[in-house]
């Protein structure tokens, strides 16, 4: 049994933005540290720069809010976690966070979420949708401002 850290990062698209660059950088950093690094995404401009020898890339519809695709992603992510013996799922967005949450429960994998921005919550339904980002084993706030936002709005 291998004790090597194996991290699956899940992000809707790998285009150019703070969350995306963070995902890209962490994936390559983990591989340099002799950990196994995986990314699940629907695609994006940064995918062509992923070092495929160091980071395993899965193209899946994790960007979708369609309930059928969210359910499909639960099964896809669960299979990835089980097949590759992933230790940690790290999700950086609300839409895929729902799939990751249930995949982590099914597989008993640790779940980390990164809260990169403030989310509107004009209704209690929207606030509930956003709250998935706090239902993990570890929540990372992207800044002190985001930490304050989380503390004040999601007690």
Regions found by a protein language model. Give the residues of each.
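Membrane-interface segments of envelope glycosyltransferases acting on lipid-linked substrates or membrane lipids
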Residues: 1-155
């Amino acid at each position: 049994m291998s004790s090597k850290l194996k991290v699956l990062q899940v992000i809707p698209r790998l285009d150019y933005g703070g969350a995306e660059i963070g995902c890209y950088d962490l994936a390559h950093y983990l591989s340099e540290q002799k950990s196994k690094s995986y990314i699940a995404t629907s695609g994006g401009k940064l995918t062509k720069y992923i070092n495929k020898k160091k980071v395993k890339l899965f193209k899946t519809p994790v960007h979708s809010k369609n309930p059928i695709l969210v359910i499909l992603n639960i099964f896809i992510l669960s299979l990835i976690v089980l097949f590759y013996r992933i230790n940690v799922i790290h999700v950086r967005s609300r839409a895929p966070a729902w799939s990751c949450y249930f995949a982590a429960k099914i597989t008993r994998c640790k779940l980390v979420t990164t809260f990169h921005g403030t989310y509107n919550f004009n209704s209690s339904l929207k606030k509930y949708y956003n709250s998935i980002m706090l239902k993990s084993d570890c929540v990372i706030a992207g800044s002190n401002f985001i930490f304050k936002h989380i503390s004040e709005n999601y007690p």
